[in-house]
């Protein structure tokens, strides 16, 4: 250890000791009987939507699917943020339409609100075209993502979905947030 560094460290230690001798222990002046606990409510700010936002007008079927996603999220005991991520994911994957087999236009064997694939273990075609089942399956995957509550929506959705277009989910965050705000308590 060089001499200058050692002298500096000794000076800092000496000042810390001297401060304690002259000032005395600070906690000794406080009266623990008078101490009152202070409750502080802290609510994490909702993340701001990333990038340009898209919006579509929903028909009755799509609105029913929004409500089904919210109901499944509540049933799973998850917060509104999980519903926002789920709805944004479904907006990207199917525009909130419960898609069956699309023939030649289909991406492999992807089905339902989340374009889940039976061959990837999401469930049977009948299961993944059931909005409650497909949402619950998506939420099960979301729960396995460490820190999903605090990460950008597109990152959380992509970790579950493993899409060829990982950033595409972000464009639906504002509409998903608005839909959850509109239907969560209805």
Map each language-model feature to its residues:
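N-terminal export and membrane-targeting signals
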Residues: 1-16
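C-terminal region of N-terminal signal peptides and the immediate post-cleavage residues
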Residues: 20-44
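Export/targeting segments at the very N-terminus of extracytoplasmic proteins
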Residues: 46-91, 95, 183
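Peptidoglycan-targeting cell-wall enzymes and recognition modules
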Residues: 49-56, 94-153, 162
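Soluble non-cytosolic domains of exported or imported proteins
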Residues: 56-64, 76-84, 125-133, 150-154, ...
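Extracytoplasmic/secreted envelope proteins and their assembly/folding machinery
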Residues: 63-70, 83-87, 113, 132-139, ...
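Short acidic/histidine-centered micro-motifs embedded in hydrophobic/aromatic stretches
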Residues: 88-92, 156-159, 163
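Extracellularly exposed regions in secreted/surface proteins, prominently low-complexity, repeat-rich
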Residues: 165-186
């Amino acid at each position: 250890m060089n001499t200058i560094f050692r002298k500096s460290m000794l000076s800092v230690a000496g000042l810390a000791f001297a401060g304690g001798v002259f000032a005395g222990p600070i906690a000794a002046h406080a009266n623990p009987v008078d101490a009152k606990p202070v409750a502080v409510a802290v609510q994490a700010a909702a993340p701001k939507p990333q990038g340009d936002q898209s919006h579509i007008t929903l028909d009755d079927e799509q609105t029913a699917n929004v409500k089904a996603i919210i109901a499944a999220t509540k049933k799973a005991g998850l917060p509104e943020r999980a519903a926002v991520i789920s709805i944004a994911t479904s907006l990207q994957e199917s525009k909130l339409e419960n898609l069956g087999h699309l023939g030649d236009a289909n991406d492999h064997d992807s089905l339902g609100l989340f374009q889940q694939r039976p061959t990837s273990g999401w469930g049977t075609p009948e299961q993944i075209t059931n909005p409650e089942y497909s949402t619950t399956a998506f939420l099960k995957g979301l729960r396995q993502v460490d820190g999903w509550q605090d990460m950008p929506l597109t990152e959380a959705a992509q970790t579950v979905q493993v899409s060829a277009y990982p950033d595409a989910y972000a464009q639906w965050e504002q509409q998903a947030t608005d839909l959850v705000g509109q239907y969560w308590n209805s």
